[in-house]
Amino acid sequence: MAKKKFSKDWIHQHINDPYVKMAQQKGYRARAAFKLIEILDTEKLMRRGDIVVDLGSAPGSWSQVARERLAGPGGVVDGRIIALDLLPMEPVAGVEFIQGDFRDEAVLQQLQEMVGGQPVSLVISDMAPNLSGVGVADSARIQHVCELALDFACNHLKPDGALIVKAFHGSGFSQIVQSFKQRFKRVVERKPKASRDKSSETFLVARDLKS
């Protein structure tokens, strides 16, 4: 009974969520688009000519935002957007997509080959592992995913590039922040208005690689 009530509460909240309605009106595939938009506007990130890598891209709302930001005359992407997810993603015009597990060495190699040695301007990651409900195990999974995104960014970003990663407050969060601060000159936490109040998610924005 409790599970059914939770389900009904979630559906009611979802239907009445203003960001869900705005996403539908603007053609975004998920309300998460507004989280990225707020972060980009606040941090003044992403512009035409950038090379952007979108990790954990499905269903595609962040790639849609990136496409809007990089669109030049005639709507053609000025720059590159490379997206990756374990799940399938409906095509987004101008976005190069790889379906595969970012933790898989062969998939990572495919992504690196697609980047082709070009200096990346921005890595955005909305990746989140499947959670078990066991605190210690979940914290380790979250930390691992964040560290993978961090390692990729440090190996491919240009010196003044940036990384946006979803993380969750809880055990292991301070270690994640510390790892980011060891590699970047500036690291800030952002909780966009579109993040639900009850959610422990926060976004780390790291800028300017340390030499």
UniProtKB/Swiss-Prot annotation:
Keywords: Cytoplasm, Methyltransferase, rRNA processing, S-adenosyl-L-methionine, Transferase. Its EC number is 2.1.1.166. GO terms for molecular function: rRNA (uridine-2'-O-)-methyltransferase activity. The active site is at residue 166. One of its GO terms (cellular component) is cytoplasm. It catalyses: uridine(2552) in 23S rRNA + S-adenosyl-L-methionine = 2'-O-methyluridine(2552) in 23S rRNA + S-adenosyl-L-homocysteine + H(+). Coiled coil: none annotated. The keyword DNA repair does not apply. SUPFAM superfamilies: S-adenosyl-L-methionine-dependent methyltransferases. It is an enzyme of class 2 (transferase). It is found in: Cytoplasm. S-adenosyl-L-methionine binds at residues 60, 62, 85, 101, 126. InterPro entries: RNA_methyltr_RlmE, RNA_MeTrfase_FtsJ_dom, rRNA-MeTfrase_E, SAM-dependent_MTases_sf. Specifically methylates the uridine in position 2552 of 23S rRNA at the 2'-O position of the ribose in the fully assembled 50S ribosomal subunit. Belongs to the class I-like SAM-binding methyltransferase superfamily. RNA methyltransferase RlmE family. This is Ribosomal RNA large subunit methyltransferase E. It comes from Bordetella petrii (strain ATCC BAA-461 / DSM 12804 / CCUG 43448).
